[in-house]
Design a protein with these regions (language model features):
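Solvent-exposed edge beta-strands and adjacent loop segments
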Residues: 2-76, 128-143
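N-terminal cationic amphipathic segment used for targeting or macromolecule association
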Residues: 13-16, 115, 193
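Short beta-strand and beta-hairpin "edge-sheet" elements
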Residues: 41-42, 106-157
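Structured, beta-strand-rich domain cores
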Residues: 58-123
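Intrinsically disordered, low-complexity acidic/polar segments
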Residues: 84, 156-159
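Surface-exposed beta-strand edges and their flanking turn/coil or helix-capping segments
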Residues: 88-90, 143, 160-164
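Glycine-rich loops and low-complexity Gly/Arg-rich segments
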Residues: 99-103, 153-157, 173-176
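Intrinsically disordered, low-complexity terminal/linker regions enriched in Pro/Ser/Gly
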Residues: 161-196
């Protein structure tokens, strides 16, 4: 057998910060044209690319063949009253319906510009997930919600559109303001005077 040298390939770059991976949800009953929901105060997220293999011994040796996909997305967040995403998950668990879920890498190094569009495209995975044991934990600190979305079939690769304004709004709780421009706490900023 002839010796062949094909070299090596090395990836160089900055490691991806977990803060640049965002998860979005949507009810399967949401009308066409509805926005995706960003679960409030996500603290952790993760994807499991599991599955089963058929593993058999034969007279000719071992055979291993892929059998099933068992993918899941786990999310943990702090509970905020009025957060629609938690209601979507709880309702889906009650009704037996799935939830649409996107895992999006929101990093400028992987963004794709779109000609004549105000948004960029970011690498994403999409799937329909069945909620498994949504849990709301009322401890001594902040109320925490966690749940697993077991993916039906397997996650599909695609591109998720986001504008710079979307990203800025998600990354910051509020924008810069001058004195007297607004009233209200950071969670209830008002730009018009209250009616008297």
């Amino acid at each position: 057998m002839a010796e062949t040298y094909n070299g090596i390939k090395k990836t160089v770059g900055k490691a991806l910060s977990a803060k640049k991976v965002w998860y979005f949800l949507q009810s399967v009953d949401a009308p066409i044209g509805s926005p995706a929901l960003l679960p409030a105060y996500q603290t952790e997220g993760g994807v499991t690319y599991g599955g089963e293999n058929v593993d058999e011994q034969t007279k000719m040796g071992r055979i291993i063949i892929k059998s099933t996909d068992e993918q899941a997305i786990d999310l943990t967040q702090y509970f905020v009253p009025g957060d629609e995403s938690i209601e979507v998950v709880k309702d889906a668990k009650k009704t037996g319906k799935s939830v649409k879920v996107w895992r999006v890498i929101v990093d400028e190094s992987v963004a794709e510009d779109v000609t004549d569009a105000e948004y960029k495209l970011y690498p994403a995975e999409f799937g329909y997930g069945m909620p498994d044991e949504p849990e709301i934990s009322d401890g001594d600190e902040l109320v925490e919600a966690s749940y697993t979305l077991n993916i039906i079939g397997s996650l599909q690769d695609g591109k998720f559109p986001l504008t710079d304004e979307d990203i800025a709004a998600i990354e910051a709780l509020y924008d810069y303001q001058n004195p007297g421009e607004t009233t209200g706490d950071y969670s209830d900023i008002q730009t018009t005077p209250p009616a008297q």
